[in-house]
Amino acid sequence: MGRKKHRTIPAVEVYEKSDGFPMPTAPPMSPSRMDGVYPSHHVPPLHQAYHVQPASANHVPDQIARFNVIKPDRLAKRHNPQLYTKRGCTDVFCCFLFFVFLCGWVVVAGFGIMWGDPQRLIYPTDSEFRRCGVNLEGSYNFSKRPYLFYFDLTKCISYATALGGCQTTQLCVKECPSTYFSYLQLRTASVSEIQNKMKSVVYCTDDVDKTTVTTFQALQNLVQRGKCVSYTVKSVPVLQRCFPEAIFNAVDNVNNVLNSSNSLDYLKRTFGDDALIPQDIQITGQSSEVMKSVVEDQPVTHKVIHDLSQTWWQTLILIFAAGILSFIWTVIMRLLGSLIIWLSILIVLVALGFGAGFSWLKWNTLKTTGAIDDYSFHPAFDAYFEMPTTWLVVAIATSVLLLIFLLVILFIRQRISIACALISESSKAIGSMMSTLLFPLFPFLLHIGVFALWGSIAIWLASSGQEVCRLKETNGQVYNTSTKCDCTAKVTGCTYVGIEKESETIFWLQVYNLFAFFWLSCFVTALGDIALAGAFASYYWARDKRHDVPTFPVIRALNRAIRYNLGSIAFGSLIIAIVKIIRVLLEYIDHKLGKSQNKAVKWFLMCLKCCFWCLEVFFKFLTKNAYIMIAIYGKNFFSSAKDSFLLITRNIVRTVVVHKVAGILLFLGKSMITLGMGILSFYYFSGRWVVEGVPKVDLYYYFVPIVIVVIGSYFMADLFFDVYEMAVDTTFICFLEDSEQNDGSLERPFFMSEKLLEILGNKNDIPLHSK
């Protein structure tokens, strides 16, 4: 069959000695080589490096046939695309653009640091926007008042509104209330008792002089004006905010309700009712019946923490065991991958055949016994399966599926064999380069770093703004038109009024920051992919697998990518990042429109989101194959993407079969490892399996460590199988290139394994070593 040879080596180019492979020896009179680089017109002729038996003269070029011995392994190296391929910096403009963008990201971070203060998000603010627990020189000193107290929590709809600001007076306090109190208790109190309560349990705004409050009428007036609190409940600090303890502690909650003086209901019954005093049910949001049902219970969080503290080392051991099983599965796929695939196909055929046979038999039985069809509504769904037509439809459907599946298998059986052989070769590649299994830790750590950078900048930007202080007017009030003053200066009457924000500017800076996160994350992923692809490609194109594969193949491939291909990596990751940010903006627009959008707009947005999701999936597939071509030939991104896309479209059936077969194996591997570790952890943590010598653990919720083991096992398996998937994809692209560019002659030998040659019915004119 004719083969395209559009990748033949040009006549005059510069070739680099790469990965430690020996170059042919230069002739005595040739110019000196410099740093392992030769101009191609000084590369020594084949007859000076290789020797040929006279009997082979009819099968090799004339200039080789005059010599005695042929060394085909060395000859094959001349056609290794990783050795004799022109290498140079690719997509330099994109690389420059990427670094300019990173400089812009630094500028955005600088704006965030200049304008922002994360303490504004960490520390709560009172009704006058002053931060609790903070000392702002010249304005206020709340360093000894770290907690935020809400005058009336019933005006807060939810925790979210409480954290963001309730429509009630908020006050920074030294400590949260430790007792239940109603101002109605002081209706008949003496002056000394009122003054004592004002100091200890009554909270008022800072403009109230509590020492002047000596009568109940004065206190009632302040309460009605919102200057003093009408009640307090026993509270605990949560995120530096005071919340009723009853919400978090069921035991105390029940005790408060059941005829205890530690409740607002009791105080109302004893000292009188008032519209300003809520019921306990309004504060806690829980009924007394629910409280009673959990009277003997402890907080769930405490139990979960207890379970984790008791099982952390067993959990880590099981997750580590999942990693070992993942490695063992790669060995199993190497030895039994073909068997697993053909066995799966056989099981599907048998299942369809059994289903078809049973359905025809059931239809014949019902038809013979005189069963009738009645497809009116039946509450019992089983009634429809007592009708012959139902089984006739099922029989026809399963028979058609069986026939189609059988024809497809017969048509693509050779391609399935190729897929199995490629998977076996990928397993061999991983087995010979064990460092590939550890390499994903490197991009994983980089991803953590990128996420930390993005999160930090996002927090600084979210807290951006300028603190504004204004001078009080003659009437003691502060207005938006009042004169501004320096918050750090000790000026009489200078009052803190809030924070001014450039909302639109901050929004677009956040968009820039998010786009930087997407681009850099995709860049890190691409860098890891191209490094692994380079390592696996070096294995495929090595004739002698034991000697020609370079030492530290992943590090060499990573170095090659950083040295030459950063621009191409930036180009590919930029495409994915653009699609991602468009999808985020579409979600933002959808959220902003909310319920106001009509059905047409909603449908249009849904279509756009679906299209861009499909586009992202397609571009991820395209860029991944482009990175493999870059790792092999070192071309720019566009050329590599075009070559890989055309290569795949010319072999679309092979591509689909290989990806589906590999997907089945990887899915089976992930599922079996995750399911197996889940079952094992279930039997152990539930106490059904007792290990001799290992103390039995008593847990409140044994499903907690089981869930952690299952999730950890899945991610551990995914870590291994991502490498395996990259190995299969790279080996497949190399195989397609090998099939199209080589013909088995001495000048262009195949690099594929003997098994693949046998499946394709090809052979090399002179057998070359392939170990």
Swiss-Prot record:
Example GO biological process: transmembrane transport
InterPro entries named in the record: Choline_transptr-like
Keyword field: Glycoprotein, Membrane, Transmembrane, Transmembrane helix
Topology class, membrane: Multi-pass membrane protein
Transmembrane segments: 96-116, 312-332, 335-355, 392-412, 441-461, 514-534, 566-586, 603-623, 662-682, 701-721
Residues bearing carbohydrate: 141, 259, 480
Domain of life, source organism: Eukaryota
Pfam family, one: Choline_transpo
Record's keyword annotation contains Membrane: yes
Subcellular location: Membrane
GO-annotated molecular function: transmembrane transporter activity
GO cellular component: membrane
PANTHER family assigned to the protein according to its UniProt record, in alphabetical order: CHOLINE TRANSPORTER-LIKE (SLC FAMILY 44), CHOLINE TRANSPORTER-LIKE 2
Family membership noted in the UniProt record: Belongs to the CTL (choline transporter-like) family.
Descriptive protein name: Choline transporter-like protein 1
Species for this entry: Caenorhabditis elegans
Lineage start: Eukaryota, Metazoa, Ecdysozoa, Nematoda, Chromadorea
